Structure formats: structure tokens, C-alpha cells
């Protein structure tokens, strides 16, 4: 059995040192600390958090993927500080209530698809490996990508590919899918990837032609942006005064949501309101430092870290009572 300090060779935690450094001010308070890893994956960030925590501290680990839960339970079976729950991170408030945890000190969410999910063809996330066109992070949830593609309208497919995949050729791809499924069901990852490659212009280089489309379908199938929008306020409301939330995002749609939320734009008063700065109410939280990206060494050793962005926010004193 792998120990909690032993890394999982199939998955490398992104921005690991930077995340721990950013959360460290919330982890050493002189009292018993409670932390949450809202996206446990294979436990890389969790293990680093546990190495930072003391014997009286506790860590709650969440993941929606049952295979990740099994791996986490095996990895941390001998650590009594760890609580593991299979849940979406949008269920954070519900899980904390069940544990009777009123406040926590630090929360981490790594929004990326884990390497085991990408590398295991049977999960249906990869356009490089042939497998069933599934893409569900929780295989028992709702419909698969193949089931959606079998009935989606051209308008729906175009919207998903354009909004979630930021695909410029969304409509031609949607039309090609409609034509292809009239001949045979689209049920395999390489079947869809090859279809998309035939549609995109040959001069489109720099990444696999199916990258954006697969991203868009995956985000839609797993309701990833809706999950994130539900998670962020729950996480911030769960923090004690001075507690910190760290979020690692991997594409611009996620990062824009996180950036806007961390800036507390919904709580800001218009500059047209005639109030002095001293009269303005304090914001409920504020960004803690600048956004961080992986350095040259990490991007060389782990190419999947190239698009990662770490943002951290701290709960304000007057709003965490």
C-alpha cells in the first residue's frame, strides 16, 4: 500500500508548493485546524496538506469519482485525521453540516481532470485513446456524452461547443455530427475525434483538432461551470475569519468565474454612489496575492500544468462571524 507521503505515479499534483505556501497562513493558527480538499483526485494535494498539518488537525477530502474515492481511501487508510466523502464540491455545505463543522480554516479545489481520468480509455475523456464516449466524472450520473450526442439538436451542439469549448467552428462540427449519426451512432472517442478533424481547416495547428470540442462536451456533461458557481460561495461562507480558499483552474471559462468571484464584484458599490472610502462597507473577502502560473521547470516536467492558474482569496474578519 502506498503511504500518504508517497506520490501517485499516474498523477502529478499541479502548483503543489505554491498552493501550500498560499494556504500556510491559514494552517498555523495555534488551534486545531480543519481543512478541505474539495477535489481529492489521487491525493497529491491532500498528502501535502497533511504533511503541513499537526496531529490534532483534520482534513476532509471530497471527490465525485468513485474510482478516486477508492484510491483515496487506500492511500490514507492509516491516517485518522482524514475524512473522505464521495460528493460533488457543490455539496460542500451539505457535507460540512453532516459533520457538524461550522467553520474551516482552508479549502482547496483543483478543477482539472485528473491524469487517470484522461489516460484510462474506458472513461471516455481522451481524444487520443479509443474508448466509449462517456466523459462522466461520476459514471453513475445522468447521461453520457454519447447519449447526449445521439439526440442533441444542431443548435444545442453549436451552443455547447461555442460557449464551453470556445470552438470557432462549432456550427460546422455540429452539422457534421448530425450527418454522421444518421449513418451510425457516435459511441467512441476516436470516432468523434476523427470526425472533428475532418471538419477543421488543415491550417489549424498547435493542438489536436478535437481539443476544444471535447472540452466543451465534457464541461457540459458534468455541469462543471454550474458546479463551480455553486461551490465558490459555499466555500467562502464556510471559512473562518482569515481562512483561505485556493482554486486552481485550467481554462479561461473557469478562471474568469473565479477571478470575478474573488474580486467580490457583486458586493462592490458603484463609483457613482457619493460615499467616502471610509464609509464603504468592507468586502466579504479579498484576493490574497496575485494569480500564479506554473514555472518553466513544472511545465517541462508536467505539460498538463501549462494552462493552470492558482488564485487565492481570504475571508474578511467582519463577514465571517
From Swiss-Prot:
Cited SUPFAM superfamilies: Putative methyltransferase TM0872, insert domain, S-adenosyl-L-methionine-dependent methyltransferases
The record's GO molecular-function terms, alphabetically, read:
rRNA (cytosine-N4-)-methyltransferase activity
Enzyme class per UniProt: transferase
rRNA processing as a keyword of this entry, yes or no, is yes
Q: Which InterPro entries match?
A: RsmH, SAM-dep_MeTrfase_MraW_recog, SAM-dependent_MTases_sf
Q: Membrane-spanning regions, if any?
A: none
* GO biological process, any: rRNA base methylation
- Keywords from the UniProt entry: Cytoplasm, Methyltransferase, rRNA processing, S-adenosyl-L-methionine, Transferase
Catalysed reactions listed for this entry: cytidine(1402) in 16S rRNA + S-adenosyl-L-methionine = N(4)-methylcytidine(1402) in 16S rRNA + S-adenosyl-L-homocysteine + H(+)
EC number assigned by the record = 2.1.1.199
Q: Localized where? A: Cytoplasm
Please report which protein family the annotation says this sequence is part of.
Belongs to the methyltransferase superfamily. RsmH family.
Q: What does this protein do?
A: Specifically methylates the N4 position of cytidine in position 1402 (C1402) of 16S rRNA.
Name of this chain's protein? Ribosomal RNA small subunit methyltransferase H
The lineage, from the top, is: Bacteria, Pseudomonadati, Pseudomonadota, Acidithiobacillia, Acidithiobacillales
Amino acid at each position: 500500500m502506498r503511504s500518504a507521503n508517497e506520490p501517485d505515479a499516474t498523477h502529478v499534483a499541479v502548483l503543489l508548493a505554491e498552493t501550500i505556501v498560499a494556504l500556510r497562513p491559514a494552517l498555523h493558527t495555534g488551534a486545531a485546524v480543519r481543512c478541505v480538499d474539495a477535489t481529492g483526485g489521487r491525493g497529491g494535494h491532500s498528502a501535502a496538506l497533511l504533511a503541513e498539518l499537526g496531529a490534532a488537525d483534520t482534513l476532509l477530502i471530497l471527490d465525485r469519482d468513485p474510482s478516486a474515492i477508492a484510491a483515496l481511501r487506500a492511500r490514507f487508510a492509516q491516517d485518522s485525521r482524514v475524512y473522505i466523502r464521495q460528493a460533488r464540491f457543490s455539496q460542500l455545505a451539505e457535507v460540512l453540516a453532516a459533520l457538524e463543522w461550522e467553520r474551516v480554516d482552508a479549502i482547496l479545489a483543483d478543477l482539472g481532470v485528473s491524469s487517470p481520468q484522461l489516460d484510462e480509455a474506458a472513461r471516455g475523456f481522451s481524444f487520443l485513446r479509443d474508448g466509449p464516449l462517456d466523459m462522466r466524472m461520476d459514471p453513475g450520473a445522468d447521461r453520457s456524452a454519447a447519449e447526449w450526442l445521439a439526440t442533441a439538436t444542431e443548435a444545442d451542439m453549436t451552443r455547447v461547443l461555442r460557449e464551453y469549448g470556445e470552438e470557432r467552428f462549432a456550427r460546422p462540427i455540429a452539422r457534421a455530427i448530425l450527418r454522421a449519426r444518421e449513418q451510425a451512432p457516435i459511441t467512441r472517442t476516436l470516432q468523434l475525434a476523427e470526425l472533428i478533424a475532418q471538419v477543421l481547416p488543415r491550417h489549424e495547428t498547435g493542438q489536436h483538432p478535437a481539443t476544444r470540442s471535447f472540452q466543451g462536451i465534457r464541461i457540459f456533461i458534468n455541469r462543471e461551470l454550474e458546479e463551480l458557481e455553486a461551490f465558490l460561495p459555499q466555500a467562502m461562507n464556510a471559512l473562518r475569519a482569515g481562512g483561505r480558499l485556493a482554486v486552481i483552474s485550467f481554462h479561461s471559462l473557469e478562471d474568469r468565474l473565479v477571478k470575478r468571484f474573488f474580486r467580490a464584484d457583486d458586493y462592490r458599490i458603484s463609483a457613482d454612489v457619493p460615499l467616502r472610502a471610509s464609509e464603504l462597507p468592507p468586502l466579504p473577502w479579498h484576493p490574497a496575492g496575485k494569480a500564479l502560473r506554473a514555472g518553466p521547470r513544472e511545465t517541462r516536467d508536467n505539460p498538463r500544468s501549462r494552462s493552470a492558474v492558482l488564485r487565492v482569496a481570504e475571508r474578511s474578519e467582519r463577514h465571517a462571524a
